[in-house]
UniProtKB/Swiss-Prot annotation:
Organism: Chilobrachys guangxiensis
The entry's keywords: Disulfide bond, Ion channel impairing toxin, Knottin, Potassium channel impairing toxin, Secreted, Toxin, Voltage-gated potassium channel impairing toxin
Lineage: Eukaryota, Metazoa, Ecdysozoa, Arthropoda, Chelicerata
Function as written in the Swiss-Prot or TrEMBL entry: Gating modifier of Kv2.1/KCNB1, Kv2.2/KCNB2 and Kv4.3/KCND3 channels.
Protein name as it appears in the record: Kappa-theraphotoxin-Pg1b
Main location as per UniProt: secreted
Record has Metal-binding as a keyword: no
A Gene Ontology term for the protein's cellular component: extracellular region
């Protein structure tokens, strides 16, 4: 359906993948900007 997770959306098991500019932060289980 093309849905993706925006900033600070819950991500991980059973959740939509984060939008391309975000990554799923394992620490918080939320979509966040990639950390350097």
């Amino acid at each position: 359906d093309g849905e993706c997770g925006g900033f600070w959306w819950k991500c991980g098991s059973g959740k939509p993948a984060c939008c391309p500019k975000y990554v799923c932060s394992p620490k918080w289980g939320l979509c966040n900007f990639p950390m350097p």
